[in-house]
């Protein structure tokens, strides 16, 4: 159960997680969901790219922490491609500071959160949100990361 990660860094931000960090976090998501090898792209971007993508795909004219673009295979074609995660380094750093969280822990949370979106989980209604948050908390515990929702 391992992720094949295409890591693209299109950001000059400092203190980014290592490729090994992304690999461990994504492997944990796949293992938790009992999935075999899957491939995905993680792209770390600047604020402008995040804002442009968020406006184009979600109609929101502001940067966001993570965007998930699930891969949809054509009918009859089975591929182990999950899709793409686009993470805005500046937004993640700002949120970590604002929420008094360790930057590394917030990065882990955003990657786990985004990967669960790629697997079809969502938080549109309360029941979905509770399920998704519980999965995130359970996966993050493996890395000794506290419940990111405990202060909300």
From Swiss-Prot:
Keywords: Cytoplasm, Endonuclease, Hydrolase, Metal-binding, Nuclease, Ribosome biogenesis, rRNA processing, Zinc. GO terms for cellular component: cytoplasm. GO terms for biological process: rRNA processing. Coiled coil: none annotated. It is found in: Cytoplasm. Its main location: cytoplasm. HAMAP family: Endoribonucl_YbeY. This is Endoribonuclease YbeY. It comes from Pseudoalteromonas atlantica (strain T6c / ATCC BAA-1087). The gene is ybeY.
